Amino acid sequence: MEFEKIKVINPVVEMDGDEMTRVIWKFIKDKLIFPFLELDIKYFDLGLPNRDFTDDKVTIETAEATLKYNVAIKCATITPDEARVREFGLKKMWRSPNGTIRNILNGTVFREPIICRNIPRLVPGWTKPICIGRHAFGDQYRATDLIVNEPGKLKLVFEPSGSSQKTEFEVFNFTGGGVALAMYNTDESIRAFAESSMYTAYQKKWPLYLSTKNTILKIYDGRFKDIFQEVYEANWRSKYEAAGIWYEHRLIDDMVAYAMKSEGGYVWACKNYDGDVQSDFLAQGYGSLGMMTSVLVCPDGKTIEAEAAHGTVTRHYRVHQKGGETSTNSIASIFAWSRGLAHRAKLDSNAALLSYTEKLEAACMGTVESGKMTKDLALLIHGAKVRRDQYVNTEEFIDAVAWELKRRLLGNNSRL
């Protein structure tokens, strides 16, 4: 039966990627997107060969297009190391495209698990998702560190641009070897982090928690706490109270303990390092990185970039290159499309598109809950003795989702 395609009013930016995720990306478009939607895609190839060919200019162009059109949907990409430089014959070791895009958009990355009833969780009490936001700027990730090989004084010096007066602190008097580190953050970046976090929690109608260690880092982490409170009081308190949700600051150790015993259903705003660590902890606790969404949200809440939380699945791609069968989990990549298109639908007030995205996500979960799943999920249920008849291959899973999506659309759409 022919479908009357849903018209997507405004464009979306598509960022193609690398390896096995590039393979499943095409399956997703051909089987789950194009048969149902009439949409204008602004396509950018962020595959590593094209980034190298364009001297990485394509990454910057992609970010600029995202700011123009407000919605981007990204396939997983390779961040090259020395081995990849040799493998692809690259001109240089290009930076992470995610980092470049994130810096241009000034956004916060929010990761959220996809929960299926029949997939066991290492933390069984997590019956609702925990959405974790990582402030991916500054701190240890832009720090300057050094090895000290001899006795001497370590000092921290600040020289104001418009003054000759220095502020100088003696950090430590070394009597022997050691290590040292200096790191920073900016009010502008922390404020953007606060706005993105407040917006995301409000959209979900979930409470928001910020975790820091301000009892130890009284000034540094205290600045995060103070700015979040300022933003909340100025822009969000009345909205949160009307929605029956709240914002609260917690110590990181208290927050980790709370997370372990909670049922989920909240947004957790983390500083850079905490978010790096805790997002993988949450992914494993819920079952799999293959079942994690990742959305970069800008401070105004208008511009987002959606992607899968995992990498390019190199090991499966090597099998695919040799003509072997793979069973690669495409759910997080499908959800990149659904979350991006859902945001497009909200910006455009497109009820038909929003309904389609909800049915697409429900089709994914319904397919898994009916017993059709890829090997990684079957292993979580059946363990190492999983049999071949207990999972489907890469394309079979997407075909099963497409069938389930059609069934759901037919049941509720009189145009079909």
Swiss-Prot record:
Q: Which UniProt keywords apply?
A: Magnesium, Manganese, Metal-binding, NADP, Oxidoreductase, Peroxisome, Stress response, Tricarboxylic acid cycle
Swiss-Prot/TrEMBL cofactor(s):
Mg(2+); Mn(2+)
Q: Where is this site: Critical for catalysis?
A: 141, 213
Query: Top enzyme class of this protein?
Result: oxidoreductase
Q: Where in the cell is it found?
A: Peroxisome
Asked if the keyword RNA-binding belongs to this entry, the reply reads: no
- Entries under SUPFAM superfamilies matching the protein: Isocitrate/Isopropylmalate dehydrogenase-like (SSF53659)
Q: Give the Enzyme Commission number.
A: 1.1.1.42
The residue numbers the entry assigns to motif Peroxisomal targeting signal are 414-416
Q: Which PROSITE patterns match?
A: IDH_IMDH (PS00470)
Top-level lineage group: Eukaryota
The cofactor remark states: Binds 1 Mg(2+) or Mn(2+) ion per subunit.
| GO terms for MF | isocitrate dehydrogenase (NADP+) activity; magnesium ion binding; NAD binding
Q: Which residues bind substrate?
A: 79, 96-102, 111, 134
GO CC field:
nucleus; peroxisome
Q: Which reaction does it catalyse?
A: D-threo-isocitrate + NADP(+) = 2-oxoglutarate + CO2 + NADPH
Q: At which positions is Mn(2+) bound?
A: 253, 276
State where NADP(+) binds: 77-79, 84, 261, 311-316, 329
BP-aspect Gene Ontology terms: isocitrate metabolic process; tricarboxylic acid cycle
Name the protein family.
Belongs to the isocitrate and isopropylmalate dehydrogenases family.
Function, in words: May be involved in response to oxidative stresses.
This protein is called Peroxisomal isocitrate dehydrogenase [NADP]
Gene expressing this chain? ICDH
